[in-house]
Amino acid sequence: MPVQSMSRIISYWAARQADRVAIDHEGRAITWGEFEERTNRLARAYSELGVQPDDFVTIALPNGIEFFEACFAVWKLGATPQPISAKLPKSERDQITDLGKPSLVVGAETGAFEQIVSVPQGFVPGEHLSAEPLPELTAASLKAMTSGGSTGRPKLIVSAQP
């Protein structure tokens, strides 16, 4: 496989094996073709909500297909996912969003933040959004993780490498 950006990996595999299973998790599976279409529509929904290239997007979802869909949709916009535990108490989640200043929080109830747009777990993009491939975009950073805050306030660890 030639080197692919994170925003193109799904497109690459969907073009070669659209009907093969991409993710199988707890009895639910999606194919590469479905994964491609769903992440394209989700990326367009996130864009409509204000996500732009090089933004941080906090993802507070449990492990599973929806988590991967959110991360790849963010990468397709040339933005940077900032995954956090879906089980974090609100006070810790607020500290992390204050630190990262994301343009969107995925996995928090709508209106959970005064100044940040959020969408709940189970968010489904509108059917009007295209499932066609998006232009290739690559963020300056691959991911933004947070430290545990064991020496005080959590810190943001931004990485350009997997």
List each language-model region with its residue ranges.
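Conserved ATP-dependent adenylate/AMP-binding module captured primarily in the ANL superfamily
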Residues: Q82, A86-E114, P125-G126
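Cytochrome P450 catalytic-core helices
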Residues: P62-F72
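Short hydrophobic alpha-helices that are characteristic scaffold elements of the AMP-binding
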Residues: F72-L77, L99
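Conserved AMP-binding A3 loop
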Residues: T31-G33, A139-P162
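Conserved AMP-binding/adenylate-forming core of the ANL superfamily
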Residues: P2, S11, D19-G50, D55-G64, ...
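Short amphipathic alpha-helical/adjacent loop interface patches that line ligand
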Residues: T39, A43, P81, Q161
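Conserved S/T- and glycine-rich ATP-binding loop of Class I adenylate-forming
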Residues: V57, V74, T146-S150
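Flexible, low-complexity linker/hinge segments
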Residues: M1-Q4, G111, V119-L142, P154-V158
